[in-house]
Structures are given as structure tokens and as C-alpha cells.
Amino acid sequence: MKLHFSIEYLTHWGEDVRVSLTLVDAKGRTQTQTYPLETRDRHRWTGEVLITDGRIRSFYYHYSIYKEGRKFRTEWGFIPRHFRVDVTQTYLFRDNWQDVPLLSHLYTSAFTQCVRPHTAETEELPYFNSTLMLKVSAPQLEEGQALALLGNQPALGEWNPNFAFRMKETGLYEWSVTLSAAGVTFPLEYKYVVIDAKTGDFVAWEGGENRVLPISGVAKDEVAVISDPPLRIRGNRWKAAGVVIPVFSLRSEGSCGVGDFGDLKTMVDWTVLTGMRVIQLLPVYDTTIHKNWMDSYPY
């Protein structure tokens, strides 16, 4: 099985891009190795890795930047690029660097476990004789919404929202779809659209110009994976009532009255009774971090 990596990243003198690949076997054991990529223009970095271990069942990877041999920058990596293994396929990855997204707060446990619990089960995607896979993140989707694909040819609805090709959720806020490349005409122009998860009814187009597939074709026994920039739709801003309080101001009959952490439980109960949903605490510092006069000014 061959893995071909390709990513756009403009480097400076002394910098290079490397990919860290983690292989997972049937027993869940992992092995990680980092491979240097090559470039001709300091902009497009490419590399190839050959996997010969037949026990491997899946793999994931991320990119890092090295400067004079030392790693100094790594991708955000909160959502790993994870794929199941098909030893009959050659994988071609066309990636974009993953910076911390503007909507990174939607990936925190406050949202994924409390405000908007994420309970959707991820689904596996089918492979074809020649496979085109498109992936995009869409954390701004509302409950009851899903993502679909529309394009400039019959296989993708010819821009008719009534024939949008529905995508599957394959990770946290990550939506993917696989197409048989034999049914796709290149060049391919497309957009992602929001649909109703139950009825499939059209909801909204993403903004901006049409996306254009950065490849000219897919050969037999190849899986071309296109990891697109995030969905271009402005989501509704989540709002809630809350209270701000420093821990040292908390007082209760069951504590010493000097801001015990145990008083936070009572504070949470009071917040719930008042109908509020958020508690913001002022920073709590270890006041012995510097061991000098600065420790008396934690802010």
C-alpha cells in the first residue's frame, strides 16, 4: 500500500515540512514515524510512504514544520486525519495546513458535551475501482442539519439543489463523501450545501466562488482524498445568560468563607436555579510560579 502526501505550505530558508504517520494494527497497537517531504518551489511539499505490514488496519497523520532540524510548529490536529486500510488501494492526499479554526470554541467539551452534545455515530465510506473522496469540516451546522454536495455535472446534480449528493459524518463536525471517479468528468467544480437531515430538503448554499478539484483524474485502485478548507457558511452565534465571579469571592455556610473550591458546587446549583447556563471564573494561578514579588500580582 502506498501513501502519497501533498500539502501547500510556504516555507522560509532553513524550514522543511514533515509528516508524522501513525499505524494502528488489529490489536490497537500503534507505531509512529516521521517522514521528510520534498519541494521544488518551497510551496508544494510532497512525499511517498510504502506500507508493507499486513497487520495494519488503520492509520492517521499530521504535518509539522522543522527549522534547522528542530520541530517548531505543528498543525492544530484536534481532528486527526484518520483512514481505514485497504491494501489494494493507493492513497493520494491533497491537504491544507490545519491552523486553529475561527470556530475552535465549538470543539471544546463545553459545547460537544454540554451545550450541543455530539452524539452522531461516524460512518464508513465505500471505495470503488477508482475513488474520489472529499472531506470538509462544518462545526457551524445546527441540530437537524446535514451536508451535501452539488457540482457542475450529472453525477453531482448539475447545480440543482433537489439532487444534492448527501454526505456522511465521519468524525467530529467532519463530513465526507466518496464518488466513483469513473462517473466524474474533470475538471470538477462543486460546492457544499446545507440540507435538512431528516427530509433532505435544501437549506442553504455555502458562500464564495465554486470550489475546483485540484486534480485532473484518478487512476484504477487509487483513492484521491481532497481535504477542503472549512464550510463557508456563517453559523448562528450561540448566546446564553451567565455570571462572572472570582473564586475568592465565594462564601457559603459550609466553607471557611475564603473562596474554597468546594463552594463551586453550590455556585453551580444556584446558577441552575436562576436559569443561567454559564459561569465564568477569573483565572486561578499558582502563586509560587516565579518565587518573587510577581507572585502577588497574578493578573
Per-region residue spans from a language model:
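Catalytic "initiation/cleavage/transfer" segments centered on a nucleophilic residue
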Residues: 89
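Extended acidic/polar, glycine-enriched regions
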Residues: 202, 207-236, 262-266, 278, ...
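Acidic/aromatic-lined carbohydrate-recognition and catalytic surfaces
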Residues: 232-299
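Short, Lys/Arg-rich amphipathic segments at extreme N-termini
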Residues: 2-13, 20-22, 134-137, 243-252
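Basic K/R-rich, polyanion-interacting modules in nucleoproteins and related proteins
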Residues: 1-11, 94-145, 222-236
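Non-catalytic accessory regions flanking glycosidase/transglycosidase catalytic cores in CAZymes
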Residues: 126-127, 192, 270
